[in-house]
């Protein structure tokens, strides 16, 4: 008997859809990894009101431009997701932004979560989520 193999790709969280592109956390992770950054923290928020994704990065030491990173990420996501590429080409989905967080931002966010009862060793966040569901205003850390 040859039973079909099923590969589990994604749970319900970590998927965002602003204009029909259905972007997966795994696609974003691959795109971010291609940048070869020394990341301390990364958070990507889907802003449905502005029709764009905003990436927040805390870097260990690099002096890079958020605009340059946004350009490269956009290219990688267009290669990884045909619907993303089509929505970008039609300008239904606006160009993503990369905002660089101040040093120590991750620690402040993590300590706040721990102060609200989350266990320090178990703290983690979903990389890709909707802005309106994220508990912090990351613009305060830019």
Give the ranges of each region predicted by the language model.
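AMP-binding adenylation
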Residues: 1-142
């Amino acid at each position: 008997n040859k039973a079909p193999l099923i590969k589990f790709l994604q749970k319900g969280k970590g998927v965002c859809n602003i204009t029909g592109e259905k972007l997966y956390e795994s696609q974003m992770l691959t795109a971010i990894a291609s940048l070869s950054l020394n990341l301390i923290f990364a958070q990507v928020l889907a802003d449905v009101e502005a029709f764009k994704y905003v990436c927040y990065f805390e870097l260990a030491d690099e002096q890079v431009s958020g605009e340059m990173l946004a350009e490269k990420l956009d290219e990688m996501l267009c290669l990884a997701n045909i619907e993303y590429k089509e929505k970008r080409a039609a300008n239904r989905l606006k160009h993503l932004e990369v905002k660089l967080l101040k040093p120590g931002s991750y620690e402040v966010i993590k300590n706040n979560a721990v102060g609200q009862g989350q266990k320090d060793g178990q703290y983690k966040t979903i990389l890709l989520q909707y802005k309106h569901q994220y508990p912090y205003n990351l613009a305060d850390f830019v």
